[in-house]
Amino acid sequence: MIKILKILIKLFLTFILLLSVYVVYLYIQNPVVVSRLGAVIMGETPGIAEVVESNYAYPINKATVKTISAESIQSAMEYSQATGSHALLIYHKEALVLEHYFPGYSKQHITSTASMHKSVLALLIGIAIDQGFIKSVDQSASDFLSEWANDQRSKITIRQMLQQSSGIDYPEFSFHPLGEWNEMVVGDNVLKITLNQAAEKEPDTEFAYNGINPQNLGLLLQRATGKRYSSYLSENLWQYVAEEDSYVILDSEINKMPRMFCCLDAIAKDWLRIGILLLNKGKLGDKQIVSESWVDEIISPSPLNPNYGFLTWLGTTHQENRIYNNKSTATAFHSEPFFDNDVIYFDGFGGQRVYIIPSKDLVIVRTGSIKMNWDDAKLPNIISQGAL
């Protein structure tokens, strides 16, 4: 028995030694990616935060009468708690019905909401069109992305990028620390990956949800407006909406390129305000921040995926396991059809969500721990069916 124990200890120590050597090797190959992956594991921000300034908090009145049943709110709270949520906010009939922060979290807490950022980018593209920086969604992306002008990518329009049907190639998710996917997500030169992807398919032949289209759209926006992304976001959206500053994450001090396919860090209540903006067709108070016609475009089903508009998900048809793209086995679980047929939602990795249901005058925000088995039908159905 002692001999077996000694052998097991030796094997364990050998494994630790080999693992350490491998980590050192990876670090030598790409210290930025490896150190930032370590930061992710430790729950830290994998990059440099750049402030998006707020200036004015759109006021949200608290509900003075019951408009959602106590049973529905209790069920929503129980599901949220069971899934490690940090915040649950419910807005119904022009009033805040619930603003709850779970133990260990507060109103000021910022949860990384990953791809929810994509839907904010869609709003900004519309604002840039309203302001005349971009002619229309059917303009060639290569008018701004000159790197695409002399190859097959010159066929790609802004609309196709917004609908994730551009045909551009994209890196597959990989656990390999030095693979393209990790380079894109935590590396120090995001455009080296995103701007250099080739056209894999003809535009408008396949829906493929990925980070390449939105990242290149963000670059396009910077070039079209002549402004840094964080400044344009602040001046045209955040300062009219938000209570607190938010943060975009830059790839490096040298390149200073925000990751626009993810990584807009903001408090839950400001995400609620963005949801209310869509609910109100681009208007908050007396100010039309983005045109109503643009919001209608955002929430119109795209030809290749009726459950997707412009960088925003829709509940048009039921899919029990919603597919993101054909390269990935990852899906989003829907235990049942949405109770309402007009659900609009921002989808952030692991259950970060803003649900908007115009027919019920309802917005729901959930931020929290990453849950790979998040049920997209649960919260909106529980709450909607309890609406009085």
Residue ranges and their predicted role:
Residues 244-245, 301-363:
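Active-site Gly/Thr loop motif
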Residues 82-85, 109, 349-351:
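Short, small/polar residue-rich loop motifs at catalytic or cofactor-binding pockets
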Residues 2-105, 130-134, 382-388:
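N-terminal leader/targeting segments and the immediately adjacent pre-domain N-terminus
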Residues 365-388:
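C-terminal/domain-terminus segments
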Residues 94, 111-137, 161, 217-221, ...:
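Active-site SXXK
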Residues 131-169, 196, 225-262, 266:
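Active-site helix/loop module of the DD-peptidase/beta-lactamase fold
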Residues 165, 175-251:
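Active-site cradle of extracellular carbohydrate-active enzymes
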Residues 213-220, 260-284, 352-367:
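Active-site-proximal alpha-helical segments within enzyme catalytic domains
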